[in-house]
Structure formats: structure tokens, C-alpha cells
Amino acid sequence: MYAAFLGLGMSVAILGPTFQDLAENVNRNISSLSLIFVGRATGFLSGTMIGGVLFDHINQFFLLGASMVATAAGLYLIPFCKTAVLLIITMSVFGASVGVVDTGANVLILDLWGDKGAPQMQALHFSFALGAFLAPLLAKLAWGTAPAQNHTESDLDTLMLNRSSNGTSDSVFAVPDDMNLLWAYASIGTFILVVSVFLFGLFCKKHSRQKKPRASAEGARRAKYHRALLCLLFLFFFFYVGAEITYGSYIFSFATTHVGMEESEAAGLNSIFWGTFAACRGLAIFFATFLQPGTMIVLSNIGSLVSCFFLVLFDKSPLCLWIATSVYGASMAATFPSGISWIEQYTTLTGKSAAFFVIGSALGDMAIPAVIGILQGHYPDLPVVLYTCLGSAIFTAILFPVMYKLATLPLKREDQKALPTSSRL
């Protein structure tokens, strides 16, 4: 499962450093192609909901193996798409298979280790972050194209116009002009395909279904404002995941067009973000043994606020961009798992409430990068990406104390008596 999530991290993060290459491959500029984020997130959301149902009726290893094969197929097909519509559709199918794997891996960890699986769960998400760290290196350093000239958004528009008028625009599915783009996606797809073989091997070996360890009704807890708390956490994850994906996906393009970095430098910057993210997510496994989840969230919010403030203040400084990106990646690492651990201290999570969080994060993944892509096209001279991350950091920093206040309000005695018989969300 760790290898599967390693491949998953690479497959998701590869979009950032290859975004401009994909845009050139379909003769579009970056702002007009931002809908691929919507397509991928919509597919992910659908796959998450479908996977949650299927894992109760189909062997988990078989479904995971089949989803990994579908993920690999999507990675193989993406570089061959020569129109934006076909690319968005392919990205949607790819996102659906990723959503099934994401849901299934988390469910499988809970099935195997139950409430004692916190280290395994942290290690699973650390594997994802490690894959996201390796993706830019693989894209631009291992299979990287020759360093290109830095272009503004208007330069890219002219370049796309010339390519579409000189090239053959009739084909919708063809070998890409840039073979390095093909090899970058194909290498990750091959790794995922190999992992799927081992999952099918486990399916053949284990025919019996594992028993799902569930918390007993005696240990159930319910906060006084349970539903309001879930809605606020939905918003919290919406902005947190949206900012994380936006920065990880657009920092490469931002560094080359706004700051004037070379492609190899920008790829290194992208790797620094995901590298500090992965390293601190690994360290969070040990910090969680002596720090409360709420404390880790507060520290993460402070780090995000400070780093985003300096990013906006010195948006043209390469040195500040390197340092603040490192701090921002480190600050974002522990927020998501700490948020889940924190709310479990005050109210018991059911399958429905967990799915609610996933929907919030998926919608943030879908909406915020797409909106930022459109805004960046209209205001190419403004650091829209940095403004968005700062706004999200301010919002989550204000929202968490409100959530904490709601969670710690005392529960009435009659509500506590009625809790064991309640089966609502």
C-alpha cells in the first residue's frame, strides 16, 4: 500500500511541472486549460464516493489492483491527447481511479490495524508526499526538456497561435511532439502498473475478507454542535487542500513567468515545497506521540501565515521564494491528519462524516486552482497564487479557534444519555 501511495503522489503532482508542456501539447495557454483541475477533482470526488460503496461488496485487493491499472492507463493516455476536451475527459477518468485508490487504501489501513493504525496511516500519507516530492525531479531533471526561454502569458498566447496555424490541428490523439513529456508520464504509469500486479497477487492469496474493527458504542462521543462542527471542518479542509494544491501546481509556472527562474530552478523549487511537505509529514509521526493534534494545527497555521506573508511581501525575490516555500511546505504537512485526529477527540467520526471531509477537500482541489488559473490569465502581473494562499491561511487561522470553541462546549446530560441510540451523521 505504501508503494501504491508513492505512485499516487507522483501521478497527482506530475501535473504541476508538466502543466505548461500539456498546454503546448493541446495548443492552449495555461489560463484556458485550468479546467483540467476541475475535471480531475470531479473524477476524484466521484471515485471517492463510488469506491466507498464498492469496498463493502468487492474484495479490496482486487478493486485496488483494478483501480491502479486504470490509473496507469490514464497516465499512458494523457500525453497523447491533442485537444483540450479530450485531455479534460481523460483527466476526469484518471481522477476517478485515483479517488477509488485513495479511499480504498485508507479503508484497508483501518481494516488491518483499526484504532491502533495511526502510525501506519501517517506512513501511508508520508508515502504520498514522498511521491509528490519525486514527481518534479522526474519530470524536469530526469526526463527534462532543454531549458526554454522564459515567457509571459502573452508570449505563450502568441506561441500557441503560431503552433496551431503551422501544425496539423485535425488529430485529437497522437504522439506528442515532446517525447520527454511522454516518458515522464509513462515511467510513473509503469511503476503503478507493477504495483497493481502485487495487489492482484494479494487478491489471489487472500480470499477471506478482513473484519472491520469498529469503535464500540460505549466509547462513542458526540459534540454539542456536532453538525456545525462538521460543516466548519468541511470549510477548513476546503481552503487548506485548495491552497496546498494551488501552490504545488502553480509554483512552477509562477516562478518561471513572474520571478524569471529557469525551468530547472523552478522544478527544484517545486520539489522543495513537496520535499519539506514530505519530510515534515514523516516527522509528524513522531511529534504526534507527545504533541496534541490541536497544538500541531496551531503551529501549522502560524507557519503558513508567516510564510505566505513574506511570499506576498517579497514576491519578486528568488531567495525569499526559496525560504518561504520551504517553510510553507513544512507548515502544511501535518494539518490534514492532525485535523482528523483533533475532531475525533471531541466527536466520533462515522463513515458519512469522513466522506463529508473528503468532499470538502475534493471541492477545494477542484474549485480553487481552476479559479486561480482564470484570474491569473486576467491579471498576469499580479501574484494571484500568493494572494490566494495568504487568504486561505488567514481564513483557516481564524476558523480553528471557532471550531475549538464549539467542540469544547459542554454536552447536556440528557444528550449524553441519548447518544448510544443515535445513529445520525
From Swiss-Prot:
GO biological process, one term: sodium ion transport
SUPFAM superfamilies linked to this entry: MFS general substrate transporter
Protein name per its UniProtKB record: Sodium-dependent glucose transporter 1A
Location of the protein in the cell: Apical cell membrane
Family: Belongs to the major facilitator superfamily.
GO molecular function terms noted in the UniProt entry: symporter activity
Main location as per UniProt: membrane
Keywords assigned: Cell membrane, Ion transport, Membrane, Sodium, Sodium transport, Sugar transport, Symport, Transmembrane, Transmembrane helix, Transport
Membrane topology listed for this record: Multi-pass membrane protein
A Pfam match: MFS_1
Chain segments annotated as coiled-coil in the UniProt record: none
Gene Ontology CC terms, in alphabetical order: apical plasma membrane
Disulfide feature: none
TM ranges: 35-55, 61-81, 84-104, 123-143, 183-203, 228-248, 271-291, 294-314, 320-340, 355-375, 382-402
Function: May function as a sodium-dependent glucose transporter. Potential channels for urea in the inner medulla of kidney.
InterPro entries: MFS, MFS_trans_sf
Name of encoding gene: Mfsd4b1
